A protein has these predicted regions:
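A conserved helix-loop-strand patch within extracytoplasmic ligand-binding domains
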Residues: 1-53
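Soluble non-cytosolic domains of exported or imported proteins
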Residues: 10, 25-29, 56-60, 84-88, ...
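A bilobed periplasmic-binding-protein/Venus flytrap-type ligand-binding module shared by bacterial periplasmic
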Residues: 13-25, 154-167, 190-191
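Extracytoplasmic/secreted envelope proteins and their assembly/folding machinery
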Residues: 32, 36, 62, 66, ...
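Sec-exported extracytoplasmic/periplasmic mature domains
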Residues: 37-41, 70-74, 95-99, 176-180, ...
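Ligand-binding pocket segment of bilobal, Venus flytrap-like solute-binding proteins
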Residues: 53-134
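C-terminal lobe and pocket-closing loops
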Residues: 114-179
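C-terminal functional modules
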Residues: 164, 172-229
Length: 229
């Protein structure tokens, strides 16, 4: 097998996020520590202290969030972890916060439709990623002494067979160029969700309304595609 393009050019992003309107109103909040020092901005849904939303039980990111919460001293800073119960409820908590213009702080990932609908700022963990620490402790249920760490990076590539690489010709030329930033994918997923569209509908919407694909094909193919649209 061979790697072609890194299809998510921003990688698959995971981490802790806050609404963009909170970030805009509080430009001093750039890191996880900054947010944890502003418990007043992130009310707990039960009205007692501040909240940080983790992943639902059974998701590995819950272990990582819980361990990083301990590493950064979240409880001592007035926060309690909220388990949303499901991926849908986690997304719903973001939508509800946006609807009320309230603070929200917690785990999410990109690209996703939710981040296409509700602009969010990913916060820095303000330390380099330590992969050994991540594998031995940050991501483990029995992590006794978690240390500060940055979230692991998830690279996402298109992979092709040896035969495809050797025989596909212009198909391979296309595959090695096809990559999109997460903001574009977020927006496309949000459009697809809002319009209850099919994958084919979303592809046509992309071709008609975005220009990233222009660099994936030669000028002749581009002209034919535009004429067909």
């Amino acid at each position: 097998l061979h790697y072609a393009a890194e299809v998510f050019s921003d990688t698959g992003e995971e981490g802790w996020w806050i609404p963009q309107y909170i970030a805009d109103a509080n430009p001093d909040i750039q890191t996880v520590e900054d947010a944890l020092n502003r418990a007043d901005l992130f009310p707990h849904p039960e009205g007692d202290g501040a909240a940080i939303y983790t992943c639902p039980s059974g998701w590995n990111c819950q272990l990582s969030t819980n361990n990083l919460f301990r590493a950064y001293g979240g409880e001592a800073k007035g926060f309690r972890i909220v388990d949303p119960g499901s991926g849908g409820a986690l997304a719903g908590a973001i939508a509800e916060a946006y609807g009320k213009g309230e603070g929200w702080f917690g785990y999410y990932w990109a690209p996703t439709a939710i981040l296409g609908k509700y602009p969010m700022k990913k916060l820095s963990f303000d330390v380099p990623h330590d992969n050994d620490e991540w594998n031995s402790c940050t991501s483990q249920e029995d992590c006794a002494d978690p240390q500060k760490n940055s979230w692991v990076v998830s690279s996402v590539y298109t992979v092709v067979t040896d035969r495809f690489k050797k025989e596909a010709g212009i198909g391979m030329d296309y595959i090695v160029k096809r990559a999109l930033p997460n903001n574009t994918i977020n927006a496309l997923l949000a459009w697809k969700d809002d319009n209850q569209a099919t994958g084919e509908d979303a592809a046509m919407h992309f071709l008609k309304n975005y220009s990233e694909w222009h660099n994936w094909v030669d000028s002749s193919a581009k002209a034919k595609i535009e004429a067909a649209l």
